[in-house]
From Swiss-Prot:
The gene is Ubc4. This is Ubiquitin-conjugating enzyme E2-22 kDa. Pathway: Protein modification; protein ubiquitination. The keyword Transferase applies. Residues 161-199 form the UBA domain. It comes from Drosophila melanogaster (Fruit fly). It catalyses: S-ubiquitinyl-[E1 ubiquitin-activating enzyme]-L-cysteine + [E2 ubiquitin-conjugating enzyme]-L-cysteine = [E1 ubiquitin-activating enzyme]-L-cysteine + S-ubiquitinyl-[E2 ubiquitin-conjugating enzyme]-L-cysteine.
Length: 199
């Protein structure tokens, strides 16, 4: 990795570790390898959102061209959000693409991602199914997002009805994650989910 990128990322890493604002927002960052090309972030779900109480892990890959190009960031923790792929964790956020500026930092990225959890942009989705549910069936979106937060991010909510539907599909030989994903996409309609899986 280029010396400029390494020195810059080291400085920003220290800035994030020392930032009182970052600590108050329950954001963490750690080094994955000694070359400073890969970091792991963790953001807490913001209050008054379906992600509240969850801890979401991020993969951060720093290119050799940093800071002139943005880091590649994706959610490792599965999440139900219009701007984040429920399958790959890919993120649709302008500062990670065309609106990146060399003056931006890891701190900016982490705070922006946490803010994205509180302010979804369903008209610019990464996951069209989630965006549709967000816009047309908001109550189901909230239920599903809370359920995923509980299942994957250690959230505080329990949903016995969702869990029993997942168990019904598991009893038919379907993997838990696939069962949850299909039921979520079918608005928790067990009949439609079963049809989709076995037709």
């Amino acid at each position: 990795m280029a010396n400029m990128a390494v020195s810059r990322i080291k400085r920003e890493f220290k800035e994030v570790m020392r930032s009182e604002e970052i600590v108050q927002c329950s954001i963490k960052i750690e080094l994955v390898n000694d070359s400073w090309t890969e970091l792991r972030g963790e953001i807490a779900g913001p209050p008054d959102t379906p992600y509240e109480g969850g801890k979401f892990v991020l993969e951060i890959k720093v290119p050799e061209t940093y800071p002139f190009n943005p880091p590649k960031v994706r959610f490792i923790t599965r999440i139900w959000h219009p701007n984040i792929s429920s399958v790959t964790g890919a993120i649709c956020l302008d500062i990670l693409k065309d609106n990146w500026a060399a003056a931006m930092t890891l701190r900016t990225v982490l705070l922006s991602l946490q803010a994205l959890l509180a302010a979804a942009e369903p008209d610019d989705p990464q996951d069209a199914v989630v965006a549709y549910q967000f816009k047309d069936k908001y109550d189901l979106f909230l239920l599903t997002a809370k359920h995923w937060t509980n299942a994957y991010a250690g959230g505080p909510h329990t949903f016995p009805d969702c869990d029993s539907k997942i168990q019904r599909l598991r009893d038919m030989g379907i993997d838990e994650h696939e069962a949850r994903a299909v039921l979520s996409k079918e608005n928790w309609n067990l009949e439609k989910a079963t049809e989709g899986l076995f037709s």
